[in-house]
Amino acid sequence: MPITVEDFEAARPQLLSVAHRMLGSVHDAQDAVQTAWLRAAAGHRAERIDNPAGWLTTVTARLCLDELRARRRRGEAPLLADAIPAEQLSADEAVLRTENVSRALLVLLEQLTPPQRVAYVLHDLFAMPFDQIAQVLDGTVPSAKKHASRARRRLHSPAPVEARRQARQAPDREIVEAFLAAARTGDTREMIRLLAPDSVRDADAALLPPGARTVVTGATAIATETVRFADRIRAICRLTVDGAPAHLIAPGGHPLAVLHIGTDRGQVTRITLRPVRPTDVFAAV
């Protein structure tokens, strides 16, 4: 029985979710799903397809695996947010919010090998059996399990001992989180209360609009300026960066900037913002 348009439309939301977790891009996910449908619609398959959704998922996953491997061959580093067209970035951000996708997880998935990412996404996020995953990877069940296990260890292994110590001993973490909460909602009064009167915000010029000051001093000035960047603050997740705890601004799950917030005596004293570097290594806190 051939796959019908109705079969495809019923499966499309799941296919897009699977492809997005694998590729990290709504645009690329849509391409993979559309290609899977074109292959199904070509009608060259003689055998009966009893599970259209399963067949489409397998084909989509193979296409994603091919794309991930092609990226590796081309030597492509994960795209940083400032290298992605605004329309595509908005689409990626919308998926994170509407589907409640972990921003930090999407960042960390970029550090897996293609087989590890496919095995982890299919099994741990979408509960696909390993015998089917082995078919996608063109390997054995034990090898598929090994890829998923290695992905798990990499994604969920504890941060370095020093990073965990720093995270535990980070002064006034509640103050930092309260400041970020106020920044997300544009609450200038609360930000001013949490900022020290002589606080300093130091940002790389590459992250600011042309002509904006790289250094801003004073609670009122910092709070007023921070309101302009509330959308970026809403795209924050907490990770370790090169072994040290930090906040990462990652619109749509694509890294943009590393944010460090210093405190003293219950107030925010310094905010430092720098662009993400291709050599940065991220890990769960």
Spans of model-derived segments:
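A solvent-exposed, acidic/Ser-Thr-rich amphipathic alpha-helical stretch
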Residues: 197-236
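Short amphipathic alpha-helical surface patches that mediate protein-protein
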Residues: 34-38, 149, 193-200, 246
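N-terminal regulatory/sensing modules of transcriptional regulators
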Residues: 179-182, 189-192
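Amphipathic alpha-helical interface segments
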Residues: 237-238, 242-285
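Hydrophobic pocket/interface hotspot
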Residues: 191-192, 199, 261, 266
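Active-site-adjacent scaffolding segments
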Residues: 1-31, 35-176, 187
